[in-house]
């Protein structure tokens, strides 16, 4: 395969990349415009529904705001409690395993009849005891973390109960407002996230397009240089032929 053939293959490859990148850019930009339009529509709906509320309901909304703010944190706090509990259980298991290894080493030492057996085992046992100490330290930290997360949850539950006792009627009347607000907010956040993803995809395809254009320019420059070199050699070759 000649150098010209390699260049032709490279050109075809880069042209194909350009076409693919162009198609992808158009596709992702269309999707992006659609999501932007949907976001604007949701935002208008949010403003219309959240701002256009009767004064009487606005009072209930104001009284119950603390309850729903706390309620919005509840699932995250419960998740943290579950994670801390799982980590504590893992650390307890690590401690148990480390202690079992120490016991196994002690049993092996007791069953070994060799005179220098203690010398062989003492370093290993000491190392394993250090591992037990480290595991116990990590377990203690995990236990404290779990206890702290549980306290956070208990405090939250107490605050929620207090809010219900003080503003139960207002909370009941304003619940549809806050539930609708949560739905619209979640929808807008999802749309914003999708917009960010699509913008990233568009930029990646544009970068790919630019890379292919630069590659084609380099191939073009290379071909031009080769032709220029061949042209400069041609007169000298003709002169040599005439002199002979």
From Swiss-Prot:
Keywords per UniProt: Cell cycle, Cell division, Coiled coil, Golgi apparatus, GTP-binding, Membrane, Nucleotide-binding
Any Gene Ontology biological process: intracellular signal transduction
GO cellular component: cytoplasm; Golgi membrane; Golgi trans cisterna membrane
Subunit structure: Homodimer, tetramer and multimer. Interacts with rab-11.1. Binds preferentially to the GDP-bound form of rab-11.1.
Predominant subcellular localization, coarse grouping: cytoplasm
Places the protein is found: Cytoplasmic granule; Golgi apparatus membrane
Protein name (Swiss-Prot/TrEMBL): Guanine nucleotide exchange factor rei-1
Coiled coil: 6-39, 81-144
Keyword Electron transport in annotation: no
PANTHER family xrefs: GUANINE NUCLEOTIDE EXCHANGE FACTOR REI-1, SH3 DOMAIN-BINDING PROTEIN 5
Low complexity compositional bias, start-end: 228-238
Membership in a protein family: Belongs to the SH3BP5 family.
Pfam families: SH3BP5
Function: Guanine nucleotide exchange factor for Rab GTPase Rab-11.1. Spatially and temporally regulates the distribution of Rab-11.1 to target membranes during embryogenesis. Plays a role in cytokinesis, probably by targeting rab-11.1 to the cleavage furrows.
Tissues showing expression: Expressed in germ cells.
């Amino acid at each position: 395969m000649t150098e010209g053939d390699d260049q032709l293959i490279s050109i075809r490859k880069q042209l194909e990349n350009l076409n693919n990148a162009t198609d992808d850019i158009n596709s992702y930009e269309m999707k992006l415009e659609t999501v932007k339009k949907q976001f604007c529509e949701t935002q208008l709906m949010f403003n219309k529904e959240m701002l256009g509320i009767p004064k009487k309901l606005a009072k209930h909304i104001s009284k119950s705001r603390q309850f729903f703010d706390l309620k919005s944190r509840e699932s995250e706090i419960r998740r943290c409690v579950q994670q801390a509990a799982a980590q504590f259980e893992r650390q307890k298991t690590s401690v148990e395993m480390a202690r079992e290894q120490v016991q196994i080493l002690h049993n092996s030492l007791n069953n070994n009849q060799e005179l220098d057996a203690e010398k062989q085992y003492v370093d290993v046992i000491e190392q394993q005891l250090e591992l037990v100490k480290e595991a116990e330290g990590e377990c203690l930290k995990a236990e404290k973390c779990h206890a702290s997360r549980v306290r956070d949850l208990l405090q939250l539950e107490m605050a929620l109960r207090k809010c219900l006792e003080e503003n139960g009627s207002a909370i009941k009347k304003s619940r549809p407002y806050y539930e609708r607000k949560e739905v619209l907010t979640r929808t807008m956040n999802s749309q914003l996230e999708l917009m960010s993803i699509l913008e990233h995809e568009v930029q990646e395809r544009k970068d790919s397009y630019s890379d292919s254009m630069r590659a084609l320019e380099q191939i073009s420059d290379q071909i031009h240089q080769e032709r220029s070199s061949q042209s400069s050699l041609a007169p000298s070759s003709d002169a040599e032929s005439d002199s002979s």
